[in-house]
Structures are given as C-alpha cells and as structure tokens.
Regions:
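A glycine-rich helix->loop->beta "capping" turn
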Residues: 167-173
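Short, conserved catalytic or interaction motifs in soluble domains
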Residues: 39, 75, 137
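Terminal peptide-recognition signature
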Residues: 34, 63, 92, 125, ...
Length: 178
C-alpha cells in the first residue's frame, strides 16, 4: 500500500524535485511485508510488516527502504492505514520529540492543528502526556483538534492566539509547519 501526500502531488506537478538518486517512481510512504533484507540489517526480517518513509518508489510493487526509515505496523492497522503514517509521524517525532525534546506535562502549541502534521502532533503529544493547544482557521477545524485531544483549540481568525496561549500559561514548544 502507498500513501499519497502533498510532496507526492508537488513532485508530480514538477514543483518539488526528488532527492538526488531517488527512484523516478513517485511515492514517499509505503507499507508492506519485508521480502528481503540487506547484509547487516538486524532490525527487520523477511515476513515483518512495516511502513516506511522513502526517497521515492512507494507506488511500485516493490520498494527499497533504509532499516532506520521503517516502523512496525501497529496492531489493528491495515496496510492501507499504515501507509499514511510515515511522513507525519516521523516529521512530528523529529521536530517535537527529538529536536525540541517535549516532555510529559509540558505544553505544545500546534499551528495548523487540523492538517496532517497537526492532527498527528496533537495525538502523539497527548499520548506522551503533554498539554496541547492547537490553532485552526474555522470552528469546524477547532472542534476536530479538540476531538483529537487538544486541550484548547484556537480559531486564529476570531481569537488572538498569542493572548489565549499566554493566558493559559504559555507553551514550552511550538510546532509551526504551516
């Protein structure tokens, strides 16, 4: 299974060049069964079910992934569902947890809370015990953010998010992928 995300669409339109050496076949996210592993690979074995972030080639029948760019497919998820995870999960993990080192009981402000990255950030931060505020551009998107776990959704068209966040105690980490 393959995910389809904005960079795939931009590559197809010629607006986002693939990395040097990447396959010409589109597809930055894929999920499937490991059919072969390279020498020195210890994390994965033939038959493992994985989802991976790729430089390209995810739309092909077979794709090549670095072992560090693959994740086990969580129990209960289909291949199709899992194929939609790598780009957002790895982006949020790298930015929020590795770079910014968000910790339990800290507060994360997510701009664009109803986006793919935003919805993933809300859920991951909550799962790790953080308090979450999320901005969005209309009432429906604010409700979605709160349904996904944001403690407070902020409609930036009708509220001054800086004032709201300050009044609620501030934020330790800000994720702005907009």
């Amino acid at each position: 299974a393959a995910g389809v995300n904005r960079p795939d669409l931009m590559q197809r339109a010629g607006l986002y060049p693939p990395p040097p050496g990447a396959p010409v076949t589109l597809g930055l996210e894929a999920a499937g069964e490991v059919v072969e592993v390279g020498s020195g690979v210890t994390r994965w074995h033939v038959g493992d079910k994985v989802t991976a972030l790729l430089a390209g080639g995810g739309y092909a029948e077979y794709a090549l992934a670095h072992e560090g760019a693959a994740l086990p497919i969580p129990a209960g998820l289909s291949m199709i569902e899992a194929a939609a995870l790598p780009e957002t999960v790895m982006t949020v993990w790298a930015n929020v947890f590795e770079s910014a080192a968000l910790k339990p009981n800290e507060t994360l402000l997510v701009h664009g809370g109803a986006s793919g990255i935003g919805t993933t950030a809300i859920q991951m931060a909550r799962a790790f015990g953080a308090r979450v505020f999320a901005t969005a551009g209309d009432a429906e998107k604010v409700k979605l953010c709160e349904k996904l776990g944001a403690h407070r959704g902020i409609n930036y068209r009708t509220e001054d998010f800086e004032t709201v966040v300050r009044d609620l105690g501030g934020a330790d980490v800000v994720l702005d992928m907009v």
